[in-house]
Amino acid sequence: AAISNATSTTSQQSTPMKDTEEANQGMAYLETVRSRTVTIYLPLLIFVFVLLFPFYWMVITSFKPNEELLSRDGNPFWIIQPTLSHFHKLIFETAYPEWLWNTVIVSTVATVVSLACSVLAAYAIERLRFKGSRQVGLGIFLAYLVPPSILFIPLAAIVFKLGLFDTRWALILTYPTFLIPFCTWLLMGYFRSIPYELEECALIDGATRFEILVKIILPLSVPGLISAGIFAFTLSWNEFIYALTFV
């Protein structure tokens, strides 16, 4: 009986302790949620709002009629009378489809040409180990830092002499002047991360340098090639000075 009474007393004492611990854990959880809300979620919400608001403004502006755009009385954050007249005018009353098609062709071809040249250049600099390869790599990086506006005048003279003004080839041939240095510099770092022992094993088995490049280096460099291709395509798409002058 004494043992049972002691057990019941101990259980009765442990029950309030458990309740207190659970209450403390609950309060700590609430404090954690509040701190996360203040320190993480609230700044993240503000960041997302600042990031997405320009796109929202762009979309609602494209659907507003001219009267609503110029009016000071309406709500600038909402559309009262949506319209598709702006899209109709852009597509059917301007040469926008042709401009878009030219941009796609020029950016795609320039990106492919630049990647092909950059792969060969980056592999030669990083793997062939000829005298002065590091200096060549540094020169390529410095060439990337040269602003396109400095190359504008000599490139314009070359394009004029070749008779390529107002053609797509004028941009396809000039865009690689700033795409190849960038892609080469980017791929040099990626090729450097690939173990050289893989190439040594392939050389022992009788593979040529071209076979090593195609069958070993390129498959392992797909993420780097994708990154370089995305950056090159973006730079080509956003370029304005050459496109405004040469075409």
Feature-to-residue mapping (PLM):
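A structural signal for multi-pass alpha-helical bundles of membrane permease subunits
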Residues: L30-E31, R36-V247
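Transmembrane alpha-helical segments of polytopic membrane transport and secretion proteins
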Residues: A1-L45
